[in-house]
Amino acid sequence: MSKGILGKKVGMTQVFAENGDVIPVTVIEAAPNVVLQKKTVDSDGYEAVQLGFDDQKQNNANKPEKGHAAKAETAPKRFIKEIRGVNLDEFEVGQEIKVDAFAEGDIVDVTGTSKGKGFAGAIKRHNQARGPMSHGSRYHRRPGSMGPVDPNRVFKGKALPGRMGGEQVTVQNLEIIKVDAERNLLLVKGNVPGAKKSYVTVRSAIKSK
């Protein structure tokens, strides 16, 4: 069955394997999550468990958020996500989920919000090739052709300049190098999306071999 936990990206560092290899890792702080709700086929049409992470000030939460958290006897949460594909019998509302749910060697998918880059051109945003920079060329870093004359419009999806980043990104099949239960830390091999202190979701990999 699938497993999942919510956390906050701390940053990157490196650890040494037993054979001396250097492994780049991302540190994810995953303080105990609280099960806020169990969704069933009868009531919601699908099965999932709703987790909450990072307490929110009571003054910043509205009345529905406070009432939803009160059912689990906890404080309102800043970050709430659902994890599907789990065995609902293993969860109870108000239960805490800790990092020891995962083990070293587990393969996971990590979802986060990519760093915002602001308004970017087609070369940076879509890896488009630039034009010649000399020999009389007047086409350097522009978007290029908008398409043929006949449709008399620009097709959806045309690679054009625009706001880059700030999107949901999932990096798949990352290995958990270490689980630090005392400090509520997960060390994941490689990089994960987002800036430092941004929220991430760690789930069991769906395409792992």
From Swiss-Prot:
Sorted keywords for this record are: Ribonucleoprotein, Ribosomal protein, RNA-binding, rRNA-binding
Q: What Gene Ontology terms describe what this protein does at the molecular function level?
A: rRNA binding; structural constituent of ribosome
Q: How does it assemble?
A: Part of the 50S ribosomal subunit. Forms a cluster with proteins L14 and L19.
What is the protein's species of origin?
Halalkalibacterium halodurans (strain ATCC BAA-125 / DSM 18197 / FERM 7344 / JCM 9153 / C-125)
Residues of the region (Disordered) are: 128-152
Task: Please give the Pfam families that the UniProt record associates with this protein.
Answer: Ribosomal_L3
Record lineage: Bacteria, Bacillati, Bacillota, Bacilli, Bacillales
Q: InterPro entries attached here?
A: Ribosomal_uL3, Ribosomal_uL3_bac/org-type, Ribosomal_uL3_CS, Transl_B-barrel_sf
Q: Which family does it belong to?
A: Belongs to the universal ribosomal protein uL3 family.
Q: Which domain of life is it from?
A: Bacteria
This chain belongs to the protein called Large ribosomal subunit protein uL3
Alphabetically, which GO biological process terms does the record hold? translation
What's this protein's function? One of the primary rRNA binding proteins, it binds directly near the 3'-end of the 23S rRNA, where it nucleates assembly of the 50S subunit.
Question: Which Gene Ontology cellular-component terms appear in the entry?
Answer: cytosolic large ribosomal subunit
